[in-house]
Amino acid sequence: MPPSLRFGVVHDFRSPPGSEIGLPEVYAQAMEQISLVDQLGLDLVWFTEHHFLDDGHLPNFVPVAGAVAARTSHVRISTDICLLPFAHPVRLAEDLAVLDNLSGGRMELGIGMGYASHEFAGFGLPRSRRVSLVEEGIQILRLAWSGERFSFKGKRWDFDDLLVTPRPVQPGGPPLWVAGMTAASAERAARFDTHLLPQGARDEVLDPWRARVAELGRNPDDYRVGIIRSCFVTDDPDRDWLPIRTAERYRASVYARFFSETPDKLSSFERGREAIPQGWIVGDVDHCVSELTSFIREYGITDVVTWGAAPGLPPSAMNASLERFAKEVVPRVRAGLSAGV
């Protein structure tokens, strides 16, 4: 049976220099919003990770996930993404196991290998090690969550006769996702039997992943495909969208800087090819329903999250839109897709 459609929010907890709101208030309002998201019956809360930025971008999702687990009862908690090369895999396995118990089995983990050179330099790691660190890390996480003693000897990590406790609530541990911008990362997600967080061009990531999953004897429709595709519901876009659009230009500029310091070609992002859409959908309920339904159907998306805050603006500024999204947009999207409309 294909996975159910899920919707939610994603947060990065940042306050750019000169913002009207400081980081303590960003965290406080985001937590209040996440409680609202849980009460509204949305399905997901995701977090991003980056390091050494003057806007305070969330560097570690673990404490925040613990706070969310303690104040919610429904939403599933995950990352888009956890930068696995910068984490000790055994410690991360322990953290996720504790979080899975704390949340009653609501944890998932989206994994990426990173690309920004300044982050690898900051952790004293050669960027050339990122593939092996991710691939060994995935193997170690799964061994650690097996509930059995394990040993591992690899290129980067070497452990002997370890038992990781507590056991996660979910058998085998929190579900894993792999993020991908290239055909190589799509192949990695298929090979390690994970869900997919695609970015970049469809024919570089999404289509090769589906083909490789099928080659391995599995059905790609049994897996989840998740993406950040934000939706701002308003009856007056000219009035309400302007401050958020201005703030979002800051986020785009930060990622452009990351790509500019990257020594290799990542994907369509820097070659000007058309990527899987991740821009905002802005408009009234009918417009948002139509655009989101078409997007989900065209790309086979199962999980959609919208930004819970624009950089430098209070998370509370998004709450009215989120309420309409949950109450007026999501039910119609679900109904339309299930009916084949």
Predicted features, each with a name:
Residues 1-76, 172-174:
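N-terminal beta1-alpha1-beta2 module of alpha/beta enzyme domains
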Residues 24-36, 95, 180-187, 287-294:
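Short, acidic/polar
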Residues 41, 49, 68, 99, ...:
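Conserved, mostly hydrophobic/aromatic
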